Every structure is written in C-alpha cells, then in structure tokens.
Regions:
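Conformationally flexible catalytic loops at phosphate/diphosphate-handling active centers
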Residues: 1-20
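Active-site proximal loops enriched in glycine and acidic residues that flank catalytic Cys/His/Asp
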Residues: 33-36, 58-61, 74, 83-87, ...
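Generic long, charged, amphipathic alpha-helical segments
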Residues: 36-73
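A short, charged/proline- and glycine-enriched loop
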Residues: 24-31
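Peripheral docking tails and interdomain loops at the edges
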Residues: 80, 84-139
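Short, well-ordered alpha-helix to beta-strand connector turns
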Residues: 27, 77-78
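Feature captures the catalytic cores and cofactor-binding loops of soluble hydro-lyases/lyases
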Residues: 50, 66-76, 85, 92, ...
Length: 139
C-alpha cells in the first residue's frame, strides 16, 4: 500500500510545478529556501537590487521534492546560499539526501529561535557571497 502511495507522489511531481523560481538566469548566487523564508529572501533581493545576479529556488512542498528542476538550478549557480530557520539545518540535510548539493560552493545560513528571518540577515549573507568574502561553512 505504501508503494502505491509513493508512486502517486512521482506523478504529482511530474504534473505540477512544485516550486517558485525567480531572479537571474545564470546567477552568481543561487538561494535555496522554502516556506516563509521565501518571502523574506525575495524582499532582500529586491531591496539590494541584485535580481540580475541572484536567483531563488523555493520548493512549495519538500515532499515530493522537484529534484530534477532543483539539480538543474544548483548546477546553474556559481555559489549557493541555503536559508533556513533551523539550528540543525534540517532543510539542508533533506536536500543533500535528494540532490547533489556541493559543499564547496554551498553556504548555509541557519539559526534557531521562534523569530522569523529578517531581510537584513539575508542581505548580509548575500553581500558576503557577492563580494567573495570567505565564511566558515557549518553544515
């Protein structure tokens, strides 16, 4: 019975667009986020006026994850920023089980707490990546 249910997920992923993608076609920085973080990321990019240098891939649901589209997005980016409100970087770990998320070009901005992300937090990380300032990668 479970196998039958999971086969239905594949059909859903093939039939519907399960993600939002916006920004540059060949981005310097690709941002991966989901849920409420997507709106904050969109606000930060608009405020910085870097739509021509940054792109965002935001799955609407994480299961089924649109793995083919996500991998194509990852491959098109020079560097990646994963944004999430989770100290343990659960979204990042989930992505790594589904796609090739190269550690060498991936920066993870994760933190705990009940407070939502701010556009200023995202802007700080994007500025760092766009100016090639190195940062310790924790996840």
């Amino acid at each position: 019975m479970n196998a039958k249910r999971y086969r239905k997920l594949d059909a859903i992923a093939d039939r519907y667009r399960l993600f939002d993608r916006f920004g540059a076609t060949n981005p310097e920085v690709g941002v991966l986020c989901w849920g409420s973080s997507a709106g904050v990321v969109r606000e930060a990019i608009a405020h910085m006026d870097v739509e021509d240098r940054v792109a965002v891939f935001a799955p609407i649901m994480i299961t089924p994850l649109p793995s083919r589209d996500l991998q194509a997005f990852i491959d098109s980016c020079s560097s990646l920023l994963v944004v999430e409100v989770s100290y343990a970087a659960q979204f990042t770990q989930h992505l790594r089980t589904r796609v090739d998320l190269p550690r060498a070009k991936t920066t993870v901005h994760s933190r705990s707490g009940g407070k939502t992300l701010s556009a200023a937090e995202v802007e700080t990380e994007l500025r760092r990546l766009l100016t090639n300032v190195p940062q310790e990668v924790l996840a």
